């Protein structure tokens, strides 16, 4: 059988794209297209994941990407990044203060009582993982009544605009090292390649838009024993952070909008010696766009592990910056895996030629060894 290089036909490619569109619309005569509002609101965690992994805070465009890619989060994040690359870069955003977050959820597993109190907010942490079969035939009237009942049951209370951070209390007690502010700008992973060793800001930026499953898998390896972070969540926050930008005339910071974010700070094993001062807890930090608690926790654990690896040298994969940061990006890894679907006819032909030559040599060798001298 002969293998030759061929070109893909334009008509075949167009037909493949048409088949994808046909399957998207194949619900039947009673089918109705998904609205972007329905995707953004009813599949909010899916939208959050795409916003986070796409590295662009635009929930409505994330919903469009989900619809276009038929629920494939990797492809949707890819589309969102591609869109971002077409937009002009207007300015560098100043460092934002997440302590001003308008909270919808806030918990701590380190302390029962925290300043401002714990706020469970929207979570399934305490729910049974049982199928709700009543949702299979949910009527529009019942659907709309759910939010109304919830809002009617919420008491009118005066809540503060922001809550103090738990780690600030730990710092005040000397259990965490004092916060040091650095003047240099954060590493921009959208413009500069990762050349190791990289600063911590590059690691945090890479993990902030990393694929959730990849980040979780490597962090889980540390949790299971391939590492010794042993974290406790000092505080996990979900809420809307006001984006402050300088006024174009006065230069004073003004609120230009807000972004939904998840932020996690974990405290880990204490360290220190006589030369460094008294021992203190160590801190890991994770934050990402949208509501994605697992990703923020995994990121905080890996941040702590990478800090240890950068200081003492890696003793396991989760402490190796090159291993972690070059293998958690979903768009990169998906692209490399998908490229194997493209034609490799010439390279495979070369592999077969080498194999056949080796087989011929192996077959001829016994005959040569048995020949009379």
From Swiss-Prot:
GO BP annotations, alphabetical order: organic phosphonate metabolic process
Pfam families: PhnI
Domain of life: Bacteria
InterPro entries for this protein: PhnI
Job description of the protein: Belongs to an operon involved in hypophosphite oxidation. Exact function not known.
Similarity annotation: Belongs to the PhnI family.
Protein name per the record: Putative C-P lyase subunit protein HtxH
Organism: Stutzerimonas stutzeri (Pseudomonas stutzeri)
Lineage, opening ranks: Bacteria, Pseudomonadati, Pseudomonadota, Gammaproteobacteria, Pseudomonadales
Gene from which the chain derives: htxH
């Amino acid at each position: 059988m002969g293998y030759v290089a061929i070109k893909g036909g334009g008509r075949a490619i167009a037909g493949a794209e048409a088949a994808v569109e046909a399957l998207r619309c194949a619900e039947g005569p009673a089918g109705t297209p998904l609205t972007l509002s329905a995707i953004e609101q009813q599949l909010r965690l899916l939208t959050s994941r795409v916003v986070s992994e796409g590295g662009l805070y635009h929930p409505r465009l994330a919903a469009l990407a989900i619809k276009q890619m038929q629920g494939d989060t990797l492809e949707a994040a890819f589309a969102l990044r591609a869109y971002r690359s077409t937009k002009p870069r207007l300015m560098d955003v100043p460092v934002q203060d997440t302590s001003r977050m308008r909270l919808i959820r806030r918990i701590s597993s380190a302390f029962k009582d925290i300043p401002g109190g714990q706020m469970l907010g929207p979570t399934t942490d305490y729910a049974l993982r049982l199928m709700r079969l009543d949702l299979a035939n949910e009527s529009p009237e019942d659907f709309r009544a759910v939010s109304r009942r919830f809002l009617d049951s919420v008491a009118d209370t005066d809540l503060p605009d922001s809550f103090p951070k738990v780690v600030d209390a730990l710092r005040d007690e000397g259990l965490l090292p004092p916060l040091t502010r650095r003047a240099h700008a954060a590493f921009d992973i959208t413009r500069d390649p990762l050349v190791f060793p990289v600063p911590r800001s590059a690691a945090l930026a890479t993990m902030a838009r990393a694929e959730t499953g990849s980040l979780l898998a490597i962090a889980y390896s540390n949790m299971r024993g391939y590492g010794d972070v042993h974290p406790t969540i000092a505080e996990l926050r979900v809420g809307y952070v006001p984006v402050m930008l300088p006024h174009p005339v006065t230069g004073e910071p003004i609120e230009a909008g807000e972004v939904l974010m998840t932020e996690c700070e974990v405290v880990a094993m204490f360290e220190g010696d006589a030369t460094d001062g008294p021992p203190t807890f160590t801190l890991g930090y994770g934050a990402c766009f949208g509501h994605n608690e697992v990703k923020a926790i995994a990121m905080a654990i890996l941040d702590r592990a990478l800090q240890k690896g950068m200081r003492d040298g890696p003793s396991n994969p989760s402490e190796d910056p090159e291993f972690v940061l070059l293998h958690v990006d979903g768009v990169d890894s998906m692209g490399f895996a998908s490229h194997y679907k493209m034609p490799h006819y010439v390279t495979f032909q070369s592999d077969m030629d080498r194999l056949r030559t080796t087989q011929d040599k192996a077959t001829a060798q016994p005959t040569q060894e048995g020949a009379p001298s």
